[in-house]
Amino acid sequence: MIALLSALSDGKKHFYTDLCQELSVTKQQLAEDLQQLDQQGIEICCEADGCYWLAAAELLDRAFLTKNLPHQQLLIQPVIDSTNQYLLNNLSKLSNNSVCLAEYQFAGRGRRGRQWLSPFAGQVIMSYYRIFSTNCDISGLSLAVGMAVAQALTELNLHSVQLKWPNDIWLNGKKLGGILIEMKHNPHLAQNQVVIGLGLNVNLPKKIVVDQPITMVSEQQNINRNLLIVKLTQHLAQALTLFEQQGLSAFIPKWRQYDAFYQKKVKLLLENQSIIGIEQGINAKGELLLNTEDNQQLSFSIGEISLRLISDES
């Protein structure tokens, strides 16, 4: 199935017999692969003469992206296991601020090892590579990244953009996307090599099934996906430079603007207990601040923690 998707990802029409020959499969095997793609929510068009092509109308535009992001090393992989993993596997070949983009990833992962859903050409699937000195405290980096994403979306006239600590992007109270940050330490160069993964729903197929309320950009605005990638990348680059110079403290005032749960009653689900209180934003380390029911102010670092609105429990 993956080989077939790779072959079709050029956006061109392909004859059935040519696909069989190119992929070295039988007609029956090709039919089964086409059925699997359909079950994954990937729409394939066909004509009576036996031509097949992907229904996705808006594919990644290498020329447009290269022209508008001249300072980034762009690595466009139509079909890939994981954009984060691709960068992590190729650190020695990357320049600072490299960006990996994909139409579809079949082994994408989210926070705490969860699989990241990835319909073909329906999302922004990107990973951003940045080198930080070991002197730079990268605590709370995902929060700074979230604010960069929120500002990019707001600039494109999306309304009700919010952030849920520590790494979710919300739109109209539903999940729009998520952030996953992974790092490798290079002691010889005194560097932290950081890979920032971002997945953002743009235009999802109707048949997609998920276990939580989600939304997509197209429910508010018809924004060109390539333009969206450009804006996200530009805001990310600016935010990462500011973060490197001033740390997370430079972002705290803006965090309150986007914090979905600020001054609201929430429940924190820890490994062995739950704590109820009023969410009070974040501190300079990126820790969540909570005023508990017995008037304690507690702070919680990013880890095995889930945050819920009390109203979600009803």
Report each predicted region and the residues it spans.
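N-terminal lobe of the biotin/lipoate ligase/transferase fold
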Residues: 2-154
